[in-house]
């Protein structure tokens, strides 16, 4: 049986290919991919590469689909199961996996990186992914597009869980893209009184307001962000700040906004050639500030994300603005890069 799939090579090129579906090995299953979201990291891989992704790899890691074939030894899945698949696949044996930090696994395997991804009509799930990875069954009532959002939402949950505390009066989010909006959608869980979203894209800020994700929105080119935050917080500063972008100066600004014992989560990684940010150790010392980072998610966080989406506590459909068949993947990638979309979904079998 022939499948179609998208591969990336080291020259910033992507190509649509076709080939025989591989024979399953012991412990493997075949997934008919119904939905796969485009992540900013997919675009980053295409443009800049990634040490974990070899040329010719099938990328895409925000996945939902149906099991169509299993090897004889699999007991926890059956043909016809509808599932959501996340990205990070832990080994389950190293120090980090054994201490609740599976996304920091020493081996650091991931779907769409070392393992084939979801821009793919039929995807092979290997034994490690099935046994240790973020593979969760979904109900018959759950839309595949919604289920594919569990991966990025799980990363947002990880960001909050790295923030130490369980409530924050004022949360500031730099970036109104898909991640920024998902972070905002989780703010009520953390009892936020003020949710402030900052982005230069007026269209995205309008969408934030329409979705009722914030109490305040600002364009950083139109106002002095620090002054505005201090007005809102009676000069106390923000209790939690997320940098949902890859802009060096924003990382420095984010730290400067912190209240005493405030937390900043440097969610968006910077390009390799970015200059190091400057941090005042005295600011950290006297503010008792916490500077954290987060990347990826654990299988348990993927489970939590799926529960939020299936329960409707996070309204997944509000994030999806564009859907494309696999044959229009290049147009889909351009749309996802344009700033006009929130979440772009690929339907490989459309």
Predicted regions and their residues:
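NAD(P)H dinucleotide-binding glycine-rich loop of Rossmann-like/cofactor-binding domains
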Residues: 93-174
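Mid-domain Rossmann-like dinucleotide-binding core that forms the NAD(H)/NADP(H) cofactor-binding site
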Residues: 140-222
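C-terminal substrate-binding/catalytic core of Rossmann-like NAD(P)-dependent dehydrogenases/reductases
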Residues: 226-231, 272-321, 330-331
């Amino acid at each position: 049986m022939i499948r179609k799939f998208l591969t990336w090579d080291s020259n910033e090129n992507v190509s649509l290919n076709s080939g025989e579906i591989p024979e399953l090995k012991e412990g493997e299953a075949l997934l008919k991919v119904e939905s796969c979201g485009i992540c900013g990291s997919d675009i980053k891989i295409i443009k800049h590469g990634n040490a974990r992704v070899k040329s010719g790899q099938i990328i895409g890691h925000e996945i939902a689909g149906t099991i169509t074939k299993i090897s004889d030894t699999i007991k926890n899945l059956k043909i016809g199961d509808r599932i959501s698949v996340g990205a990070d696949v832990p080994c389950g044996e190293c120090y980090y996996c054994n201490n609740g930090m599976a996304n920091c696994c020493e081996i650091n395997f991931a779907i769409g990186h070392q393992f084939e991804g979801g821009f793919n009509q039929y995807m092979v799930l290997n034994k490690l992914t099935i046994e240790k990875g973020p593979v969760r069954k979904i109900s018959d009532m759950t839309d595949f597009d919604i289920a594919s959002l569990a991966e990025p939402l799980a990363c947002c949950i990880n960001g909050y869980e790295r923030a130490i505390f369980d409530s924050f009066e004022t949360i500031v989010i730099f970036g109104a893209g898909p991640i920024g909006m998902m972070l905002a959608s989780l703010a009520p869980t953390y009892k936020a009184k003020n949710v402030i979203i900052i982005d230069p894209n007026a269209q995205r800020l309008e969408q934030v307001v329409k979705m009722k994700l914030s109490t305040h929105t600002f364009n950083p080119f139109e106002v002095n962000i620090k002054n505005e935050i201090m007005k809102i917080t009676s000069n106390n500063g923000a209790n939690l700040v997320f940098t949902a972008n890859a802009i060096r100066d924003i990382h420095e600004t984010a730290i400067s906004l912190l209240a005493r014992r405030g937390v900043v989560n440097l969610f968006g990684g910077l390009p390799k050639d970015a200059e190091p940010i400057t941090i005042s150790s005295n600011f950290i010392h006297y503010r008792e500030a916490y500077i954290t980072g987060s990347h990826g998610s654990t299988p348990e966080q993927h489970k939590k994300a799926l529960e939020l989406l299936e329960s409707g506590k996070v309204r997944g459909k509000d994030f999806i603005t564009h859907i494309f068949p696999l044959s229009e993947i290049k147009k889909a990638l351009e749309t996802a890069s344009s700033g006009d979309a929130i979440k772009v979904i690929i339907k490989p079998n459309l």
